[in-house]
């Protein structure tokens, strides 16, 4: 008999990769993709409609969720509000990430008590590790100043551990989607000297799908999920490579454009533990940049090269650290630079 798998956040960056991979295993699984946005879901993963079923519900509304969370064997829980939206709307982030997951837990306890849930947590739960970049699962959890997203992840992990369901937690490093190559203002929050370890979306999606076959080995445990040694670089070097691939040239922003404190990321010193169990790694950072280059049309690279100064000026205007420095904003200077004025 096929196992029933629910994937929440199925049209997200990791979700779409998980759907792509698991859709090749319909001999093993009956796959239910859950999201709240019908149009976006059809645009991103509608091509798999012959292999999966689609359900639409608001995870914060337990009544709309209940008919879907029945007779399940597995739940891959990826639905979340992530930065920068989580920073802009912290109340929404808490409602979706924490309260929504508690709804899911309650319904699993009631209607699918034997289901095994895989939860996507985040490296953000370790807080600022700029000067102590080697991270292990047993390290203290401490979200960075102003990081509402990390707080929701810490609290949700606690809720899972206190529940009566079967679970495993994967703390995701920086997950990179080569198809999402537009500038993200969040990059300015990260100190350039940050030790940065990535994982591609497809390796991450593969991890969640592979993990379904290893319930007994990983149940009740927490793991750090990242791409490994071949996916490591200082953020300044990673960004320099990304700019070259996209046609923007040098990362030549003025001093103060990037924060120097209160972010997150580092190297997962125990990241090989999960890889040794579920064998999900295939991509290196070089492979990521190759995929990124292929995803950007040549005309776009040419235009980026031609208008690079103007584009980078526009990017600078989105830098919160830069704006805080220019305006001598007390809260901003404390958050991004650890400077009290």
What function would you assign to each model-found segment?
Residues 5-25:
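N-terminal Rossmann NAD(P)H-binding glycine-rich loop of SDR-like oxidoreductase domains
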Residues 48, 52-99, 128:
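NAD(P)H-binding glycine-rich loop region in Rossmannoid oxidoreductase-like domains
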Residues 60, 92-103, 147, 151-152, ...:
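Glycine-rich NAD(P)-binding loop of the Rossmann-fold in SDR/ketoreductase-type enzymes
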Residues 81, 102-148:
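Conserved Rossmann-fold NAD(P)-dependent oxidoreductase catalytic core, especially the SDR/UDP-sugar
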Residues 125-126, 147-148, 168-189, 194:
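Flexible, glycine-rich beta-alpha linker
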Residues 131, 143-168:
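Active-site Tyr-X1-5-Lys
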Residues 177-179, 186, 195-224, 228-230:
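Alpha-helical substrate-binding/gating segment
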Residues 214-277, 283-291, 299, 303-307, ...:
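Mid/C-terminal beta-alpha module of Rossmann-like enzyme folds, strongest
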């Amino acid at each position: 008999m096929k196992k029933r798998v629910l994937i929440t956040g199925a049209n997200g960056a990791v979700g779409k990769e998980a759907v792509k991979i698991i859709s090749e295993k319909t001999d093993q699984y009956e796959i239910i993709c859950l999201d709240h946005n019908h149009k976006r879901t059809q645009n991103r993963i509608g091509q798999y409609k012959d292999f999966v079923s689609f359900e639409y519900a608001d995870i914060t509304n337990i009544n709309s969720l209940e008919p879907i969370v029945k007779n399940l064997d597995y739940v891959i829980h990826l639905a979340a509000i992530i930065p920068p939206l989580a920073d802009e709307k912290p109340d929404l982030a808490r409602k979706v990430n924490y309260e929504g997951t508690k709804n899911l837990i309650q319904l699993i306890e009631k209607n699918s008590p034997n289901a095994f849930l895989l939860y996507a947590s985040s490296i953000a739960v370790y807080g600022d590790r700029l000067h102590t970049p080697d991270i292990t699962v047993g390290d203290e959890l401490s979200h960075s100043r102003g990081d509402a997203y990390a707080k929701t992840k810490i609290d949700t992990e606690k809720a899972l551990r206190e529940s009566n369901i079967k679970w495993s937690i994967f703390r995701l490093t920086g997950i990179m989607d080569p198809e999402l190559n537009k500038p993200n203002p969040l990059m300015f929050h990260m100190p350039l000297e940050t030790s940065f370890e990535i994982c591609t979306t497809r390796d991450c999606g593969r991890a969640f799908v592979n993990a379904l076959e290893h319930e007994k080995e990983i149940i009740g445990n927490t793991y750090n999920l990242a791409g490994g040694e071949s996916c490591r670089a200082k953020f300044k070097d990673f960004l320099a490579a990304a700019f070259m691939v996209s046609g923007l040239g040098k990362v030549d922003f003025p001093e103060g454009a990037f924060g120097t404190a209160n972010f997150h990321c580092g190297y997962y010193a125990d990241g090989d533990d999960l890889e040794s169990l579920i064998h999900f790694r295939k991509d290196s950072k070089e492979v990521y940049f190759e995929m990124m280059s292929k995803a950007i049309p040549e005309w776009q690279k040419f235009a980026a090269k031609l208008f690079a100064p103007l584009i980078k000026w526009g990017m600078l205007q989105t830098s919160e650290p830069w704006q805080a420095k220019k305006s001598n904003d007390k809260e901003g200077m404390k958050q991004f630079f650890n400077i009290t004025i």
